[in-house]
Structure formats: structure tokens, C-alpha cells
UniProtKB/Swiss-Prot annotation:
SMART domains: EFP, Elong-fact-P_C. One of its GO terms (cellular component) is cytoplasm. It comes from Alcanivorax borkumensis (strain ATCC 700651 / DSM 11573 / NCIMB 13689 / SK2). Gene3D superfamilies: 2.30.30.30, Nucleic acid-binding proteins (2.40.50.140). One of its GO terms (biological process) is peptide biosynthetic process. This is Elongation factor P-like protein. Belongs to the elongation factor P family. Pfam families: EFP, EFP_N, Elong-fact-P_C. One of its GO terms (molecular function) is translation elongation factor activity. The lineage of its organism: Bacteria, Pseudomonadati, Pseudomonadota, Gammaproteobacteria, Oceanospirillales.
Length: 188
């Protein structure tokens, strides 16, 4: 059993005998004194099926299921299916585009450190590394009179993700992006 305040995205919980993979958690802090913080959990059934949405108080106990993490490498796309290969035994895992839509903004064929999350031999999602290196494909030109203030501009990366970067970054450069915050960290 895990407290609701300790749940995180991609955890698997068991509710009424059904396994659900957490897709989103919203924290709601009430303004009244003594009121408990609420955690709104949105999840989808493992292996397909109904969606699940529930609110928990921070000290509520929730039944969680142990996940197995396997290092994988992105292999190829087949329609709406994304195929990843296990780095150890070379088995292939198929994930639907809708299940990994948020993670796709950070994954290229060169991305290292991606983990497949498995429950009872079925892959339910991906866990990304803390940061990834991506190529800048499009951005406005650098300004000659760049001031000492930290001004930023939008840059489109090779996965389609748009992040704010410092003015001195130009198209063709590699940048390191924080996957949790979706923000520029540094040049790579």
C-alpha cells in the first residue's frame, strides 16, 4: 500500500481487481485551514479498457503493483504502433501512439536511457531519462545586438517539440532538454 501523496505518473494501482496505469496526477490544495490536499488521479486500464478517474486525500492508502523496468531502444513506427527493442534479450515491445503521446516529443532513434514499464509481461508505458539531447531544426536568427539580459526565443526541435532557448542558439545545434519540465537546460 502506498499513500496517495506518494503516487507518481506511470505507477500502477489496483482498484476493484483491475490494474490501472496512472497517466496524470493533479494536486489540489484547498484554501480552508485543516483541509486535506486532494490528488486527482487519471488512469487507464492496463492492456486496454475503461479509463479511471478518482480523487484521493493525501493520507489515503492505495494498492500499488510492482513494475519491472527494461532498458529499450526505439526501433521503428508501423502506423499508430511504435516498436521498441529490449537492449538485453532483443525482444520487441509494441506501444500505441495514444499511450505514449507525451513521451514521443523526446524520443529519437538515438535516445538512450529509455525504460519500458512492464506489469505481468505486458508493457504499459515508457519512463524517460531526466534529460535528452535533441537537434534544433528551426529558430529565428541570433541578434547581433544581444543584450546582457537573458532573453529567449522559441526553437523547434527534431521531434517537433518547441522550447524556449537563449538568443545565441542557432538551427543545427544540439541542446539538452529536461524531460519533466520540457525546458532547455544547456548546449549539448
Amino acid at each position: 500500500m502506498t499513500r496517495a501523496s506518494e503516487l507518481k505518473k506511470s505507477d500502477v494501482i489496483e482498484v476493484n481487481g483491475t490494474l490501472y496505469a496512472i497517466r496524470q496526477i493533479e494536486v489540489q490544495s484547498p484554501s480552508a485551514r485543516g483541509a486535506a490536499t486532494l490528488y486527482r488521479v487519471k488512469a487507464s486500464a492496463v492492456g486496454g479498457g475503461p479509463k479511471f478517474e478518482e480523487r484521493f486525500k493525501g493520507d489515503d492508502d492505495v494498492a500499488t503493483v510492482a513494475l519491472q523496468r527494461r532498458a529499450v531502444q526505439f526501433s521503428y513506427v508501423d502506423g499508430d504502433d511504435y516498436i521498441f527493442m529490449d537492449n538485453e534479450d532483443f525482444s520487441q515491445y509494441l506501444l500505441k501512439q495514444d499511450d505514449i503521446r507525451d513521451e514521443l516529443a523526446f524520443i529519437t532513434e538515438e535516445t538512450q536511457g529509455v525504460l519500458a514499464l512492464k506489469v505481468e509481461e505486458s508493457v504499459i508505458g515508457l519512463e524517460l531519462p531526466a534529460s535528452v539531447v535533441l537537434d534544433v531544426t528551426e529558430t529565428t536568427p541570433a541578434m547581433k545586438a544581444a543584450s546582457s539580459s537573458a532573453r529567449t526565443k522559441p526553437a523547434t526541435l527534431n521531434t517537433g517539440l518547441v522550447v524556449q532557448v537563449p538568443e545565441y542558439i542557432v538551427a543545427g545545434e544540439k541542446v539538452r532538454v529536461n524531460t519533466a519540465e520540457r525546458k532547455f537546460m544547456s548546449r549539448a
